[in-house]
Amino acid sequence: MSSGQQVWHTAVPPPRRSSSIASMPRSPSSAGSPRSPGTPGSERVASPLECSICFSGYDNIFKTPKELSCTHVFCLECLARLAAAQPVGRPGGEAVPCPFCRQPTAVPPAGAPALCTSRQLQARMPAHLRREEPVWLEGTKLCCQPLPTTPGREPGFVCVDVGLSKPAEPPAPARDPAPRRGRLARCWARCRDWRRMALVSALLLMLFCVALWPVQCALKTGNLRCLPLPPRPPATSTAASPLGPLTDN
């Protein structure tokens, strides 16, 4: 008989990892920061003070940081473009979906400028950009009236079109003979005006000549008679006929 061989199994604990590696926290900015949507796999990370869609720095006019109900923050211009792209008349058309989590946010009746401004990011902006300028929506345009840079100058308006495309131009109306007759009538009226002006000018010229004619005559002839007097015939001496002798009766 062969004696059975006993094998003893000893549990070996797994090697412990370094505590410095296990306890290292993950950066929330690197985990939650979006990447550029145009280049997949790009390592560009959005700054907390710039929009994650257009990568433009926040300001106090059209790039005001607006916070959605999901606490994601984007600039006012990008949110206005998203709101303009929503279908009109459909359920949910009055809400803007978040580009990251797709959670809808109701748009106020005044439009995207009435959305909540992120005071947390606004407090981290430079001091001259913390005062939010009034921006309103006119149709598909974001409008603002910034203060003039020089004193005494009237403030102007600045507008940005956030619509998808420009409205189609109406077709040109077909031409009919009525406008042509209207043009002929206007031309005829102008011609009549010109004839009146010519007639008045001719009358004024005639009156001017009649008024200056005596002056011209006085300068040339020395009197107001323009035609020279006809020369007088020379005086002829008539010989007196001698009286004949008186005849006696």
UniProtKB/Swiss-Prot annotation:
GO molecular function terms attached to this record: ubiquitin protein ligase activity; zinc ion binding
InterPro entries per UniProt: RING_finger_E3_ubiq-ligases, Znf_RING, Znf_RING/FYVE/PHD, Znf_RING_CS
Subcellular location: Membrane
UniProt keyword annotations, A-Z: Membrane, Metal-binding, Transmembrane, Transmembrane helix, Zinc, Zinc-finger
Membrane-crossing residue ranges in chain numbering: 199-219
Domain of life: Eukaryota
Lipid bilayer topology: Single-pass membrane protein
Biased composition range(s): Low complexity: 17-44, 235-249
Positions of region (Disordered): 1-44, 230-249
One cellular component term from this protein's GO annotations in UniProt: membrane
Renumbered zinc finger spans (RING-type): 51-102
The keyword Ligase is annotated on this UniProt entry: no
Any GO BP: protein ubiquitination
Broad class of where this protein is predominantly found: membrane
Keyword Transport among UniProt keywords: no
The protein's name: RING finger protein 223
Organism the protein comes from: Homo sapiens (Human)
